[in-house]
């Protein structure tokens, strides 16, 4: 909560555990939270102590040990000591790290860098999402449409860009939409649950919620209906 510039962070019981001056705190991630102090962004640790001095125009959450920050219209990545691991640049746009890689945009195309800043997958896609479980969805122009598929960390397509909508991999499966219907693929790119559903959500604890017409179910990873929702 925030009163003026005095901020308090509470635990799940509602008890105040940290008092610190600042605004717009992020959630803690990897032990740190970003916040704004005197119009600049920095980081505090879980004791409320300033861990990285507020000097950035913007500062994002730590993921994979690195945080995306911006200064003077340029972006780069710092470690938890505040040292630049990937230097500031205005030549490209970045997103935060996930699964060891970060999205990078050059012009209107997207690719990926590793934690040393090396381009490991050249910006060649019209759209892309973070890597999850070793795979990322990408978007390509197919005729007059933009369709999605998936790549592995070597940039190899595991399925062509044939889907209208895609989700991240979760528990080894990814929800995809084809011809207006939803199904699921595995990490080999094989459609193992046919795209026959009007709605579907990602797998959790081995089951996925799906709906077809007025009927709804939880299915297992073979597509078998395990629970019928009445």
Protein language model features and the residues they cover:
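Residue-level detector of conserved, function-critical positions
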Residues: 5-6, 11-230
